[in-house]
């Protein structure tokens, strides 16, 4: 079952914008790592940020209300992405920094610094009560004076948010031939006034080269969320192999599990081995085949990443299926002919 963003924020469906803001403020303050040191607080803080990112955006919220998390992230019944080598994937992914969102919500300030910075945090204070009387939303603290001296006018050096990583799942056929993936992202961008923020969609194009190995990283610099006090994070896609219904991958080799009977293992057989490009290669075996034994078909695997004109091997891995029982007459014959 997918995430329920309303449940994450403790809201009922149909909550108003103000209720969503209040819920985010309450939950974010409760689980902020500067305040909450319990295990899992950091992950909960990220989930709260993602929930607010969706429910505070009318378009994302409408899709989520209709189709749930699966529909929002690309699997809605209204139309899935193409599965072909040049297929286009459209999906929402949260790639913002929850700490940057928190700071933006409170007008670029850290409320924990204001209230707790000179008092070592005072873990016992009730965060909800502390902030309940203050305005919410982006910039809610901007014009409030809490008795501290004004900071110097020297500009604060911006820091880049940490990289945001997403999996890029590809099939073995796509690795064999190479393909183009188009990923639609939604990120926040700073308007020309240098203060207000807009949501912006962008298509990131990834040229998957033949033979790329699992774990290959593709980086799009500074495509994360942008605010007035950060440098956007890099968006990093990490190549992951989709599970295949026939083959397994081992580097540039492709493993084909062949199931044969005990009679075939002892007496020899011909195995029709499929390939990634749709051909079938008949391979004859005359010797005894032991369970788990491997035989290679050279040059029928995946392209080598650095020299794609060369290819790895197709490896046949045998699984011998033993009979549940043997008739007495057959057992007698086997005892006579099989070596001890």
Curated annotation (Swiss-Prot):
Sorted alphabetically, the Gene Ontology cellular component annotations on this record are: cytosol; nucleolus; nucleoplasm
Q: Which UniProt keywords apply?
A: Chaperone, Cytoplasm, Nucleus, Phosphoprotein, Stress response
Q: Which residues form the J domain?
A: 2-70
Keyword Nucleus appears in the UniProt entry = yes
Per UniProt, subunit arrangement is: Interacts with DNAJC3. Interacts with HSF1 (via transactivation domain); this interaction results in the inhibition of heat shock- and HSF1-induced transcriptional activity during the attenuation and recovery phase period of the heat shock response. Interacts with BAG3.
Task: Describe its function.
Answer: Interacts with HSP70 and can stimulate its ATPase activity. Stimulates the association between HSC70 and HIP. Negatively regulates heat shock-induced HSF1 transcriptional activity during the attenuation and recovery phase period of the heat shock response. Stimulates ATP hydrolysis and the folding of unfolded proteins mediated by HSPA1A/B (in vitro).
Record-given protein name: DnaJ homolog subfamily B member 1
Q: Which species is this record about? A: Mus musculus (Mouse)
Instruction: Give the encoding gene's name.
Output: Dnajb1
